[in-house]
């Protein structure tokens, strides 16, 4: 980060830690002072690529690579146009193709690849899907409002819970001070032994703690995302494609050698007589001696029947 700097005035973050770099739609950076100086009229051209820019479009650089800031801004603009959802497509494959098209457009605009055709494609899509874009935009706005309302409600409930716990804690502290003062008064005035008074005080304290009202649990009907508990989101089901059930077919590998005995038959046929037994720590990991023996036999038998023609 220390080598980041303004390409015009050559000021770096190493020499000026409070340097604020700004980035525009072209992806090239300028410091805040240079932006104020060059765009005093509200508009101007980029010092590196001569792209016409507006002063109001400059934003603080968030990432070390300004290209990422450029990609983020481009993606925001594209997603406002390409705002279809999965339920707008008859199949999952078409929805995935739609997402892939978005990524291709963002990639082209970010890296300045085939800009004319890409912008032409965006304009054509915007004209053909004007109604769908507007409908989804209204739907997103409504959902955003519902989410903000749910978050505000959750925040209010958390505040009420905090105040309730605070009052409960203050009440308990007040009762402790009161009981302590009563004990001191009894020790001064009573003729009973101190041990009996302390035992009585301890019993009263336990009863008082048991009688203290437990904090009420604030049950909510919705999650923080706005989804009601116990409810399901209504969505268009994905079209089910009827296909034949999968049938397992054993894999046959031609080894050009004798058939290797099954792993369960190795001990009966004497193959494990001279194989080191597995240690307890090996067994814990699932290893048994027959596995290594079976693999060694596969390597030994492989290619014994091979004949060159």
Curated annotation (Swiss-Prot):
Domain UIM, residue spans: 142-161
InterPro entries assigned: Cdk-activating_kinase_MAT1_cen (IPR015877), MAT1/Tfb3 (IPR004575), UIM_dom (IPR003903), Znf_RING (IPR001841), Znf_RING/FYVE/PHD (IPR013083), Znf_RING_CS (IPR017907)
GO BP, sorted A to Z: cell division; DNA repair; nucleotide-excision repair; regulation of transcription by RNA polymerase II
SUPFAM superfamilies per UniProt: RING/U-box (SSF57850)
Listed GO CC annotations: transcription factor TFIIH holo complex
Keywords carried by this UniProt record: Cell cycle, Cell division, Metal-binding, Nucleus, Zinc, Zinc-finger
A molecular-function term among this protein's GO annotations: zinc ion binding
Location of the protein in the cell: Nucleus
PROSITE patterns documented for this protein: UIM (PS50330), ZF_RING_1 (PS00518), ZF_RING_2 (PS50089)
Zn finger (RING-type) location: 6-50
Major localisation: nucleus
UniProt function note: Stabilizes the cyclin H-CDK7 complex to form a functional CDK-activating kinase (CAK) enzymatic complex.
The protein's name: CDK-activating kinase assembly factor MAT1
Organism per entry: Xenopus laevis
